[in-house]
Amino acid sequence: MAKDEDNSSVHLLDLPWEDVLVPHILRNLPLRHILSLQRVSKPFQSLVHLYLANCRHFDSTQLGSQLPKSTFSELLRNNTVLQKLDLQSCCDWLTDKELLPVIGQNHHLIHINLNSCGQLTRQSLVAISLSCPHLQNICLGHCEWVDCLSLRSLVDHCKCLEAIDLTACRQLKDDTISYLVQKSTRLKSLSLAVNANISDIAVEETAKNCRDLEHLDLTGCLRVKNDSIRTLAEYCTKLKSLKVKHCHNVTESSLGNLRKREVVLDVEPPLQRALVLLQDVVGFGPFINLQI
């Protein structure tokens, strides 16, 4: 009986690693829990290394600030199959030295998030353009090192771009954005927010070239005016959301048609806006009887 009991006992690590444990168990665990398994035993450490070498998605936000610079390169050292790379929570320390080896050996990346990674240089974006021909979505928000030449390199080599976030990339001007949208006509989402260099020229080029555009963020683009918003409404019939807060030259005369089409806008209609201001100034309650 004791012999039968010994033969029937199955341990977790007895299951097939590549066919069962990695794709069906580890893939469903938070990254921080997977990394903690390394402390259990050497076999578990080997299992985690196998997972890291074969994982398709690496999301540093799952670790928060717990991912030290010293271990980042080690974690992805043997991975050549990444499709999604989110390094937003590495923004305080990530440099070209850490990023370039990962980019250089992963040619299947589709989604990259480098939001606020301010210590990188244009060299990283050029490397992405040369190594990631299938790239569809890239976030470069608050990466002020992004310049005209590096963005043109990205556009020239990455023909499948559908979403790009250029929030606060203040080196970019109308001519560069025009080049982007002329080459990347499949764009569905674009952010040009917080860039005073952007004017009607870039917005109109976007409207005329990116007919499938669904989401556009122009927050804080002070030079954008009603004319380009009207052009946007005319050409981008699939538009779902538009952000124009703090665009002081954009008024209801251009937003009205979009509002009728139920495009989500981040500014209230004039009457509602006036009531909110009146409530703040006079101290009225939330309900106002307009018949008084």
Swiss-Prot record:
Keyword Repeat: yes
Disulfide links within the chain: none
Subcellular location: Cytoplasm
Cross-referenced Pfam families: F-box
GO biological process, one term: protein ubiquitination
LRR repeats: 134-155, 160-181, 186-207, 212-233, 238-259
Similarity-based family: Belongs to the FBXL15 family.
Quaternary structure and interacting proteins, as annotated: Part of the SCF (SKP1-CUL1-F-box) E3 ubiquitin-protein ligase complex SCF(FBXL15).
Name of the protein in question: F-box/LRR-repeat protein 15
Gene: fbxl15
